[in-house]
Amino acid sequence: MKSTPAFAIVSLAFAAALVHAQIVVKNQGFVPFADAPIRYRSENLADPVAKLQKQFDRGAIALEYEPGRGYLPSVLRTLGIAVNSQTLVFSKTSFQYPKISPEKPRALYFNDDVYVGQVRDGMALEFVSFDPMQGAIFYILDDRHVEHPRFERAELDCLQCHVAATTTKGVPGVLLRSVVTTPSGAQAGGTPSYVTGHDSPFHERWGGWYVTGTSGKQTHMGRAVGTLDTSPFLAATSDIVAHLVLAHQTQMHNLITQTNYQTRLALYAEDARNKALNLPAGTISETGRQRFERPAEALVRYLLFADETPLQDRVEGGSGFAREFAAKGPRDAQGRSLRDFDLRKRIFKYPCSYLIYSEAFDAIPGPAKDYIYRRLFEVLSGREQGPEFASLSGGDRKAILEILAATKAGLPEEWKQSIQAVNRKP
């Protein structure tokens, strides 16, 4: 069968087996997370879906079932996920792949902490929900009408696809992968694949996706909605701005989790070393420090969009996603927010990821977070003038520093003292 010149997504994908037939994950170069100190299978979780299930268990809230829509509208409302975050993909990358095609794409929705997938006429909704300490947690929800709907954790099945050294930074995570597809939406054999982030070439993105909105002279591999019947979906759009945000956010989430895991593993090993050598508690060797400073440095670069692929023309979505996303703030006294879009030369007006406000970022262990804050301050204050951050102008750095000082809780005192000193100068 002839392949279409398109790229498809492998995003939030689940392997064919369900939670009742889990498979042991083979070691493919990823971070050890099953045992101490990570203990990924722990039931002590604080991700949004886990919190929601606890509310169900207490009888505090209930999901509403809508004929033809299932639990999806109620789930999105309860989790605070906007309908206009919808993106439509027709690659066969869900465990429900037989039901996915260009005529019946899968719908994906997201906010800062949760990703939701629905397949038309499918048997389950698919979730990736981010726990502050454990990162991506995978769930399914039976989408048939039952008296007591319940989120079921589906971990090792999902991890067959969702843990890889080169695509999810070696931790349980999320990814957008572009692959050449056949006309049915299946991946064509022997074809390349690309992981999509904000640093991906524009022309390699979004094949296998439906994309609505405009990108000017910039070309991409996405497909216009055209004759697709969008009436079964919650929205008629697959907004290009939502696609841009999704590409950034997925890899940012993975870097946060990687830094968290590597720091915990390093501190765990250092604690054992200190006890064996009778060293003072809290001593960190140079080797141990390098173990978490390497991913932390990568996080800083990505957080500040250091390698972002520049936009060559204006991008417009048209669904209202950009407006609603930006309205979430927070804003400083001048009305500036890290959620403000540029969409002419780059994604955001102030290039520092809004995920710096997330619980997952705040949960990064102290030594790594101290390093991140130190490096951020060096870059934003202008002390760091290396080529790695050349994309940030002096005005960008000053604005981001001021926005964070005004809106981000828990910053080192050095930040505020420095800004106050600058403001006192005549």
Regions found by a protein language model. Give the residues of each.
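Sequence context surrounding c-type heme c attachment/ligation sites in exported
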Residues: I23, G117-Q290, A296-L304, I347-K425
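Short glycine-rich, low-complexity/disordered patches
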Residues: N84-K92, S193, P310-G317
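A short, ordered amphipathic alpha-helix with a cationic face
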Residues: A62, L343-F348
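Mature extracytoplasmic or organellar-lumen-exposed domains after removal of signal/transit peptides
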Residues: D271, L277-I284, L304, E308-K345, ...
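Positively charged n-region of N-terminal signal peptides that target proteins for export
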Residues: M1-A6
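Boundary at the C-terminal end of the N-terminal hydrophobic targeting segment
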Residues: V19-A21
